[in-house]
């Protein structure tokens, strides 16, 4: 997918990886970049507008833990204004295994709810034009960081959901792929809590190993958007972009 002249909704587009990715996206010249985030950041929005004044950058406050009905209501405002949306990026995430319910609500249920809401506008069974979804998951969806099992499981769930969305594309007209960053230098990983304090130094220990910058991750994210491969499981780690082959151990047969 060429980003130029497209209408893009980016949930959590002002976060660590999110903001750098938003910067790279506006450089590629979309028609509209609509950022949905929990906390407004006027300085960041102004910066994005300045990077490419030809791009219309707008912000709406949004908490992914709201109901599908509330999400649909906000999306209707956006669709009424833009008429069409080409790409939805679901990027909300928290890393704090003290907050069990919120971790699941943000990292998994939030992705499901926002995706479910946009189907009201995209699903070809309802006369919609289809669309593309990029879900930010994590390499912990492949193999857990076992000291943060709640976070890791929430990302594995989001990855499984995304893989199913891709298989449903012939029915819905909506394609999907996952973005799975490795350990990236953002505020998310500088300090966080392990489950039941099983490893108080988990953040410190992780950062002793090779990481990548959020800019490296963002640049590869844009490459994945441009590749636009339905069902792709992209690993963005150590500054590299790699498509993962998923091993099938069981099949429902339906």
Swiss-Prot record:
SUPFAM superfamilies, per the entry: NAD(P)-binding Rossmann-fold domains
GO cellular component term of the entry, any: cytoplasm
Source superkingdom: Eukaryota
EC category: oxidoreductase
Single GO term (MF): alcohol dehydrogenase (NAD+) activity
GO biological process, one term: alcohol metabolic process
Assembly with partners or alone: Homodimer.
Family: Belongs to the short-chain dehydrogenases/reductases (SDR) family.
Protein name: Alcohol dehydrogenase 1
